[in-house]
């Protein structure tokens, strides 16, 4: 679980996304330590509550359930449940989800694996990352009126050299190749 969690953190960091690792509910499948990776975006489908002073973050609907409150927007500015800072609210796009299943399913299927000296019941986990959601979220965070501004780590290229008029009498192709070679250095 921890290895996958760290791998996901590295992925989101490398892509340069503004995201939060959010306490979540694993739903009907069950499990524990449920965490979702949400990329912050005004178009996000989920409302997130997070501390302005710590890593505490939770789906606002889940926090409302825990506090028997009715209105998620009422959480803005309240003390963070971890005692560090005030809560801020922002929308997020869920782009990853991890949680532990423990032995719930391996026991129900009587699944065993060979341990050092005996057969053991394995602990299971669920790990999901949405490649297309990451791309969509990156676009939400990195665009202007002219279009997409790809982060270098997601961009298919950093520079494009276009031979604008290959029929020109000037040796444009040679100039393009010269620029290309200089950029490679």
Model-derived segments and spans:
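NTP/phosphate- and nucleic-acid-binding module
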Residues: 1-185
């Amino acid at each position: 679980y921890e290895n996958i969690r760290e791998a996901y953190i590295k992925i989101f960091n490398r892509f340069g996304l503004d995201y939060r690792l959010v306490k979540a509910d694993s739903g009907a499948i069950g499990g524990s330590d449920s965490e979702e990776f949400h990329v912050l975006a005004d178009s996000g489908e989920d409302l997130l509550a997070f501390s302005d002073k710590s890593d505490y973050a939770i789906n606002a609907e889940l926090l409302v359930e825990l506090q028997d409150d009715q209105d998620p927007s009422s959480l803005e500015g309240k003390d963070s449940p971890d005692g560090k800072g005030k809560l801020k609210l922002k929308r997020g796009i869920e782009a990853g989800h991890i949680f532990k299943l423990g032995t719930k399913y391996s026991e129900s299927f009587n699944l065993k694996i060979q341990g050092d000296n005996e057969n053991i019941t394995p602990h299971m986990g669920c790990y999901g990352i949405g490649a297309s959601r990451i791309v969509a979220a990156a676009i939400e965070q990195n665009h202007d009126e002219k279009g997409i501004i790809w982060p270098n780590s997601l961009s298919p290229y950093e520079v494009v050299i276009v031979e604008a008029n290959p029929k020109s009498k000037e040796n444009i192709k040679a100039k393009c190749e010269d620029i290309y070679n200089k950029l490679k250095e």
